[in-house]
Amino acid sequence: MQTFAEISALREQIKTFKREGRRIAFVPTMGNLHEGHLTLVRKAREHADIVVVSIFVNPMQFDRADDLNNYPRTLEDDLSKLNGEAVELVFTPTPEMIYPEGLDKQTLVEVPSLSTMLEGASRPGHFRGVATVVTKLFNIVQPDVACFGEKDFQQLAIIRKMTTDLAMDIEIIGVPTVREMDGLAMSSRNGLLTIDERQRAPVLARTMRWISSAIRGGRDDFASIIEDASDQLRAAGLHPDEIFIRDARTLQAVNTESTQAVILMSAFLGKARLIDNQVVELVKDSKEEVDSIESESENSH
């Protein structure tokens, strides 16, 4: 495994691999790697000869300075895990390398509509920061394929649209969410939880399953479902951030043409903002009567 901090050195090595006809897969991360990230690496291995992983905590996508400062950084442990997966190349740039003139003078990439709805509405600039850094990393690595987790459902949709709109010749592969034994979606932010908070955290996934069951049972009173779900989270000590029920394909309101809904949830627990999602098949009778209701839960953080 080779580790590069300099863009030019990484590019030279990738050019060598490409001259040899090697297929390149890319997994961008912000470090603090867990089994979910390693699952992405293994999926990347299935689609390419060479796997490149980046570790970069992107300041442009954080909307709160304390969140950026608190984000876990575990480079030595991350490199050990990647070495265990036989990753060929690891890219570990500094913010100064990615944004040499600072964030204020950086050319920006923004995917309209998708970036400003749902989570993007409450986190202005977040998805612009994601799209910008992913575009830059794609230009540096020049991968044939890139793997992203489905846990960040809206982010994956944005990256798919971005690569299509900008005619990037990169195959985007979504990888299902990896969960702990108790159902909690694996996340680097889980490390911010205290022992007590960690015991309560699976309530997010359980509440999501309750919503899914209600929808599969034919309920289409989404506003009431969201209100009840918010109450369940509060009862367990979580602070609901956002709960949406949307068309899984368009992320717009569910309508009579929708065949699948996606439940998008986030909640605060201590210092951590937890997110999760689940796709649900819509009951035909329910679809025909749905009033395209969707609502954001009361933000009580």
From Swiss-Prot:
Instruction: State the reactions this protein catalyses.
Output: (R)-pantoate + beta-alanine + ATP = (R)-pantothenate + AMP + diphosphate + H(+)
The record's section on InterPro entries has:
Cyt_trans-like (IPR004821), Pantoate_ligase (IPR003721), Pantoate_ligase_C (IPR042176), Rossmann-like_a/b/a_fold (IPR014729)
Residues the entry annotates as binding beta-alanine: 61
Membrane-spanning parts: none
Q: Give the enzyme class.
A: ligase
Q: Which GO terms describe its cellular component?
A: cytosol
Q: Where in the cell is it found?
A: Cytoplasm
One GO MF term attached to the UniProt entry:
ATP binding
Q: In which pathway does it act?
A: Cofactor biosynthesis; (R)-pantothenate biosynthesis; (R)-pantothenate from (R)-pantoate and beta-alanine: step 1/1
* Key words, A-Z: ATP-binding, Cytoplasm, Ligase, Nucleotide-binding, Pantothenate biosynthesis
Enzyme Commission number, as recorded: 6.3.2.1
Q: Does the keyword Phosphoprotein apply?
A: no
Q: Which residues carry out catalysis?
A: 37
Give the UniProt record's GO annotations in the biological process aspect: pantothenate biosynthetic process
Domain of life according to the entry: Bacteria
* Residues the entry annotates as binding (R)-pantoate: 61, 155
Q: SUPFAM superfamilies from the entry?
A: Nucleotidylyl transferase
Which proteins does it associate with, and in what oligomeric form? Homodimer.
Summarize the protein's role.
Catalyzes the condensation of pantoate with beta-alanine in an ATP-dependent reaction via a pantoyl-adenylate intermediate.
Q: Which HAMAP family match?
A: PanC
Entry similarity comment: Belongs to the pantothenate synthetase family.
A further note on this protein reads: The reaction proceeds by a bi uni uni bi ping pong mechanism.
Protein name, per record? Pantothenate synthetase
Q: Which organism is it from?
A: Vibrio vulnificus (strain YJ016)
